[in-house]
């Protein structure tokens, strides 16, 4: 019985990155032996055990055989006869197929260390194509290690295209797809995740609403990058620079879905695209089972981002209506999220990356003025029932109007 540290912990150690989780591989043992040593079995499909003291995962060496569609369509064989190399052979990438024994010796049968040094994401074997989830995993690794200079091997990208052209991606559950998206949205370069999916053909299969944006033109005056798909990923990249909030990043990703529905005869203009995109966002979120709060923010950003861009031109009454519709009175954090997403939208254009976004501070001050209206004073003045709401609305409009009069700075309207 031999125990090895495997997977991400070994890889991240070689990259001098912090190690989050440690996974161990046990060669030459049976489930009965593990139980006798005090380990607790938790794996249903294959033998995985928790250490009796530190609760870390220890998996018995196994091989896998493809028997059906999807990432779950495998038959696993765990036995004391399965060797270290046989277990490592079933892994996705060479950089994840390195083992370290208890004395610190490294075992690298597939040249993962060489690929780490070359900053290369390369598949271990042609069995890579048997698991469609690996398309998403490789895209996530490409995004995660983008700043370190990693790129996908041409032959691996070819296999990812092969998977995308088959029916395998459709066998992935919504939960697994969203899990990979969620992890990528939390990383430093989520835009790379979607760029890779676009390159290998998976974006069209899994995210057709986003894929449809590529090739759709925008006015060059406001969008020198022209292509809406390119703009979308630029906005996502800017959102990642502005905030770690994954809901804001997702909202940035889907804020322009409605532009794919603009009539061709009207291009490159996209009148009302924010509202046109709402059904698309709802459908995408339902399909992927996106959390409700994330979905609701995405809908808000799509619906209101054009108004936010034109904030200096809006009447006080319109501004208060926006605050009412978004229920910022009870959820003021949503205003901050909306402004962050709109700032990313403004900066996600060629040549605009470092521009200021005064609309954000302007709307924040408008909200503070409106929210400062004293409801108790309205009630004390004798208003009752529906009159209270009407009086509150009028006083909020007046508060915003007075603030607007103090403002001197005006920006030209952006038709984005």
From Swiss-Prot:
Domain text from the record?
Comprises two domains: an N-terminal domain containing the nucleotidyltransferase activity and a C-terminal HD domain associated with both phosphodiesterase and phosphatase activities.
- What family is reported? Belongs to the tRNA nucleotidyltransferase/poly(A) polymerase family. Bacterial CCA-adding enzyme type 1 subfamily.
Quaternary state and interactors: Monomer. Can also form homodimers and oligomers.
* Residues that, per the record, bind CTP: 8, 11, 91, 137, 140
Cofactor annotation: Mg(2+); Ni(2+)
What is the species listed in this Swiss-Prot or TrEMBL entry?
Shewanella baltica (strain OS185)
Q: What else is known?
A: A single active site specifically recognizes both ATP and CTP and is responsible for their addition.
GO terms of biological process kind: RNA repair; tRNA 3'-terminal CCA addition
User: What is the E.C. number?
Assistant: 2.7.7.72, 3.1.3.-, 3.1.4.-
The protein's matches in InterPro entries, at most eight in alphabetical order, are given as: CCA_bact, HD/PDEase_dom, HD_domain, NT_sf, PolA_pol_head_dom, PolyA_RNA-bd, tRNA_CCA-adding_enzyme
Pfam families noted in UniProt: HD, PolyA_pol, PolyA_pol_RNAbd
Report residues binding ATP. 8, 11, 91, 137, 140
- Gene Ontology molecular-function annotations: ATP binding; CCA tRNA nucleotidyltransferase activity; cyclic-nucleotide phosphodiesterase activity; magnesium ion binding; phosphatase activity; tRNA binding
Q: Which domain of life is it from?
A: Bacteria
Cofactor binding mode and count: Magnesium is required for nucleotidyltransferase activity.
Which residues are listed as membrane-spanning?
A: none
What name does the UniProt record give this protein? Multifunctional CCA protein
Role of this protein = Catalyzes the addition and repair of the essential 3'-terminal CCA sequence in tRNAs without using a nucleic acid template. Adds these three nucleotides in the order of C, C, and A to the tRNA nucleotide-73, using CTP and ATP as substrates and producing inorganic pyrophosphate. tRNA 3'-terminal CCA addition is required both for tRNA processing and repair. Also involved in tRNA surveillance by mediating tandem CCA addition to generate a CCACCA at the 3' terminus of unstable tRNAs. While stable tRNAs receive only 3'-terminal CCA, unstable tRNAs are marked with CCACCA and rapidly degraded.
Ranges of residues in domain HD: 228-329
What reaction does this enzyme carry out catalytically? a tRNA precursor + 2 CTP + ATP = a tRNA with a 3' CCA end + 3 diphosphate; a tRNA with a 3' CCA end + 2 CTP + ATP = a tRNA with a 3' CCACCA end + 3 diphosphate
Name the HAMAP family on file. Answer: CCA_bact_type1, CCA_bact_type2
Q: Which residues bind Mg(2+)?
A: 21, 23
What are the UniProt keywords, alphabetically?
ATP-binding, Hydrolase, Magnesium, Metal-binding, Multifunctional enzyme, Nickel, Nucleotide-binding, Nucleotidyltransferase, RNA repair, RNA-binding, Transferase, tRNA processing
Report the gene name: cca
